[in-house]
C-alpha cells in the first residue's frame, strides 16, 4: 500500500475514523531530515500493509493541520489509534524506532 496524502479534507476519514493504527509523517520538501526519513516511511508502509495506514502531511500545503497538532519542527511522526494521537516523535528516526512506535500503539504487530 502506498502512503496516503493526508489533507484537512480527508484527515477525519483517513485518520480519526480509521479502524487500524495510522502513522502520520508531517514533512516538507525543503527539509533535509524529512527527505532522509521518506524512504524509511516507504519501507514501513510496505511492511505494515493491511495492518496500519501510513499517511503524509506536507506542512507547507496543510498549515492548518500542522497548527492543529502543534507541529513546530519537522519531520514529526505521530501514531493515531481510535482517533487519538498515541505516540509522537520529532526528528529523523531509524526504521526500527518508527516500527517500535507502531508496536507500542497496537498489539496487532
Where are these regions (language model features)?
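Non-catalytic, surface beta->alpha helical segment in thiol-disulfide oxidoreductase systems
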Residues: 79-109
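Short pre-active-site segment immediately N-terminal to redox-active cysteine/selenocysteine motifs
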Residues: 19-20, 26-30, 73
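Conserved Rossmann-like nucleotide-binding pocket used by diverse enzymes
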Residues: 2, 7, 27, 53-55
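Structural microenvironment flanking redox-active thiols in thiol-disulfide oxidoreductases
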Residues: 57-66
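Conserved redox-active cysteine motifs that mediate thiol-disulfide chemistry
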Residues: 26-40
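A short beta-strand-turn-helix
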Residues: 3-22
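Conserved helix-turn-beta segment immediately C-terminal to the redox Cys motif
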Residues: 19-21, 38-57
Amino acid at each position: 500500500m502506498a502512503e496516503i496524502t493526508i489533507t484537512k479534507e480527508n484527515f477525519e476519514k483517513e485518520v480519526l475514523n480509521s479502524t487500524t493504527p495510522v502513522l502520520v509523517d508531517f514533512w516538507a520538501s525543503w527539509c533535509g531530515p524529512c527527505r532522509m526519513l521518506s524512504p524509511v516511511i516507504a519501507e514501513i508502509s510496505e511492511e505494515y500493509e493491511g495492518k496500519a495506514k501510513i499517511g503524509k502531511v506536507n506542512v507547507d500545503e496543510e498549515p492548518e493541520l500542522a497548527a492543529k497538532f502543534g507541529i513546530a519542527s519537522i519531520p514529526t511522526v505521530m501514531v493515531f489509534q481510535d482517533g487519538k494521537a498515541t505516540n509522537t516523535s520529532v526528528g529523523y528516526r531509524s526504521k526500527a524506532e518508527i516500527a517500535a512506535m507502531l508496536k507500542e500503539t497496537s498489539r496487532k504487530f
